[in-house]
């Protein structure tokens, strides 16, 4: 784990975690997108928080909003124990804080509503990061770049294909990586000269504390729905402020192989979420969760080890090319190319293939599950088939994605 530095200690983080994640429905029906499970045991929010923590940035405010209960609970139970004297990881939301009586109207408005935490932080820098992406990053390298360029704002950037760029803030830079133009989610994105790709914002920013306070108070005078991409960045460019783009591909965390750098996933749709999870079960995935020098932290819980039972012809408990977390029991069944969240039980004579099972899923006997996402606590009855016949799946009320993934939601309680 990175030991931290003065840069980390002189920085506070404001993590934006209030998004609805509508394209992930029905997984976000009862939880915010950052609270969705990833990789069996983690929450999406754990990745940005681990990056900040491992970078030595251990004063973190997580700004939550939509269906915040489960996310706030996760922050409290999983992250409170990692902090030491003078450190904190606190979730705050309009419904739980007396400081704010209204919902966030924009990304910058979310910071503005809690500006007093920035003003009293005694920090040189503020890291404003999104809470709903999957990646590893040493944030202090970005802060060093920011300092070297004496920037008023540094934007973490990556190259994306032109056909995907309309989902991002897109910008142009000069030879020194200084931003010369910026457009939020353009219909016809400007490509990098000589390429079919665009420079896109990751939604991660480094500000000097005084500059952030200044631009937010100024922006408040003009925009009620103050947003970094729509308002703050264009406003700063117009004033001639020094805005620089930090190339995320240059970032290399301790223990990371060169071929692993540059991994960043939005997981904003059910198909992209499924694909990113399935990447983990490859022999050498680009996102290496076994890099103990840069761990992804979460609430481990007091779970027993996973186990397989029965070794009879036709009733053999096996997990093949799969990612199986604590407390799971594969009982006389086959799990192949799948991810099992904590405390799943797969009963005899069943097959789970190319699927993601959330925590506490119970699969009955003689069940077939193929290319599916099963939400938390779902009980699959004996003899059921999921992903084998989409007409039947639709009749059962399941969601079918464009690529044919079947999503089984939690039952109403």
UniProtKB/Swiss-Prot annotation:
SUPFAM superfamilies: Nucleotide-diphospho-sugar transferases (SSF53448), Trimeric LpxA-like enzymes (SSF51161). Keywords: ATP-binding, Carbohydrate metabolism, Glycogen biosynthesis, Glycogen metabolism, Nucleotide-binding, Nucleotidyltransferase, Transferase. It catalyses: alpha-D-glucose 1-phosphate + ATP + H(+) = ADP-alpha-D-glucose + diphosphate. PROSITE patterns: ADP_GLC_PYROPHOSPH_2, ADP_GLC_PYROPHOSPH_3. One of its GO terms (biological process) is glycogen biosynthetic process. Its EC number is 2.7.7.27. Alpha-D-glucose 1-phosphate binds at residues 169, 184-185, 201. GO terms for molecular function: ATP binding; glucose-1-phosphate adenylyltransferase activity. It holds the Pfam family NTP_transferase. Pathway: Glycan biosynthesis; glycogen biosynthesis. It comes from the Bacteria. Homotetramer. Involved in the biosynthesis of ADP-glucose, a building block required for the elongation reactions to produce glycogen. Catalyzes the reaction between ATP and alpha-D-glucose 1-phosphate (G1P) to produce pyrophosphate and ADP-Glc. Belongs to the bacterial/plant glucose-1-phosphate adenylyltransferase family. This is Glucose-1-phosphate adenylyltransferase.
